Design a protein with these regions (language model features):
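Charged, amphipathic alpha-helical linker segments immediately N-terminal to NTP-binding catalytic cores
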Residues: 78-135
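Glycine-rich, often proline-containing surface loops adjacent to acidic residues and nearby aromatics
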Residues: 115-122, 145-153
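Loop/turn-to-beta-strand initiation segments
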Residues: 176-177, 208-211, 241-247
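Short glycine-rich substrate-engagement loop in P-loop NTPases that contacts/grips substrate
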Residues: 126-137, 147-162, 169-208, 220-225, ...
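N-terminal flanking helix/linker immediately upstream of nucleotide/cofactor-binding cores
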Residues: 138-142
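Long, basic/Gly/Ser/Thr-rich N-terminal segments
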Residues: 1-91
């Protein structure tokens, strides 16, 4: 990139150099690139722009805090092939993680931005004990790249249950491809797809996901179709393919067995 030129008269060289060196943001840059006092004079505008831009990043803790005009981009200075200082832009670490997670969402019935919100991280660790030791153990095994079939957890608090499943997806999305669905909403989507096509698009995405998180089973309008053609189809196929499935419901396994035991006329 073209070198920026000093656009005002230098009256006090020492003052100019010290002004730049006083900045904690610039100090680290000077140290990393071995920037000389002469280079500070020559590239004063460049360094000032760097300082102003990176001050916006000082208190940033997530993508929600980003104040850059170009979302997720960080202003940088480096040396080119001729060892001359030049500016460029790079993706910040927060955006790298954000982009990775976004790319790894296979299918969801939820707002993607809710799943990508960095507040999910702290929520998961603050409330993880609600999931129980067995469920937590399966999640930890996944983070160690161990084979996990899945786990079930019963949580009566619907808001807590939903938030925990979303925060679980946030944790897993950094290294895994994940689908997360509220089952009743997913059924509505599949039904609408059947009206315009064979209805298998969303169903296959969910079945083939590396990890699937299902929230709220038992809360849908249960029919033989929703049970046999959708829910059991998803679970049976995923078991055969040895895919990981996490299920969360307000009902216990015994209660779910009774709910899904339909009359023979269905």
């Amino acid at each position: 990139m073209k070198q920026l030129k000093l656009n005002y008269q230098i009256e006090d060289v020492n003052s100019l150099v010290n002004n730049i060196k006083d900045s904690n943001i610039i100090k680290k840059l000077i140290e990393n690139l071995n920037i000389t006092d002469d280079e500070i004079i020559t590239h004063y505008d460049l360094l000032s722009s760097y300082q102003l831009s990176n001050e916006k990043c000082q208190n940033c803790r997530s993508m929600k805090d980003c104040k850059q005009s170009t979302f997720g981009m960080k202003y940088c200075i480096k040396r080119d092939d001729q060892n001359i200082l030049t500016d460029s832009f790079t993706i910040c670490n927060y955006y790298k993680d954000y982009y990775t997670r976004k790319k790894n969402i296979v299918y969801t019935t939820f707002n993607e931005e809710d799943l990508l919100d960095d507040s999910q991280k702290n929520f998961f660790y603050d409330n993880v004990n609600f999931l129980g030791n067995e469920f937590i153990g399966k999640v930890l095994s996944l983070t160690k790249n161990e084979k996990v079939n899945g786990a079930f957890v019963q949580l009566n608090n619907s808001k807590l249950r939903l938030r925990l499943m979303q925060s679980l997806s946030y944790k897993l999305l950094l290294n895994h491809q994940v689908s997360i669905i509220k089952f009743s909403d997913f059924l509505k989507t599949v039904k609408s797809e059947f009206k315009i096509s064979d209805g298998t698009s969303s169903l296959q995405e969910v079945i083939n996901s590396e990890i699937l998180i299902i929230d709220g089973i038992g809360n849908e309008s249960i029919t033989s179709w929703s049970r046999d053609e959708i829910l059991l189809s998803i679970l049976d196929n995923r078991i055969q393919m040895e895919k990981t499935t996490f299920i969360c419901s307000e009902y216990s396994l015994e209660q779910l067995k009774k709910l899904y035991k339909l009359s023979y006329n269905d």
